[in-house]
Amino acid sequence: KESNKVLIPVDFSNYSMKACEFGFNFAQNMGAEVVLLHVYFTPIYTTSLPYGDVFNYQLTDDENVKNILQKVHADLNTLSDKVKAKVASGEFPNVKYSCVLREGIPEEEILRYSKEYRPRIVIMGTRGKNQKDIDLIGSVTAEVIERSRVPVLAIP
């Protein structure tokens, strides 16, 4: 059964903020809650094998992982503060929202979260912060659109 939630995957880019603005308004109209989902990954050594198979070896550098986590938490707090400020100024409607942090490959975790929690809709930017201008749509967004069982709205 679907939940009354709007899932907004965020990567702290301007595209994310646009998706937030749209998503918060959408949630207000639907009487829904917003879930801001950020997926991060800890660096791994990737070895390419023939036929495009990729094997990952986890770095066991705890210090490195701790630094990544600190940065991710700081970025998420910054985003949350921005959202609070926009709600306070009336730029965003005042809807209930929560922040979720997951480790992994962004498209996989977004799809997994959708499958587990069945949001009414996924609203995300057409591209992320590491996007090349030649791409019309980001690879994460494209993958989510292709494989999601929940409606996906991509905001340019």
Give residue spans per PLM region.
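Gly/Ser-rich helix-loop-strand patches that form or flank binding pockets
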Residues: K1, E108, R112-P156
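Short, solvent-exposed amphipathic alpha-helices that sit
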Residues: F22, K71-V83, E109
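A structural micro-motif
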Residues: A32, V95-Y97, V150
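General small-molecule cofactor/ligand-binding pocket signal
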Residues: L37, S98-R102, L153
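A short acidic, glycine-rich active-site loop
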Residues: N56-D75
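Structural beta-alpha unit
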Residues: D81-V122
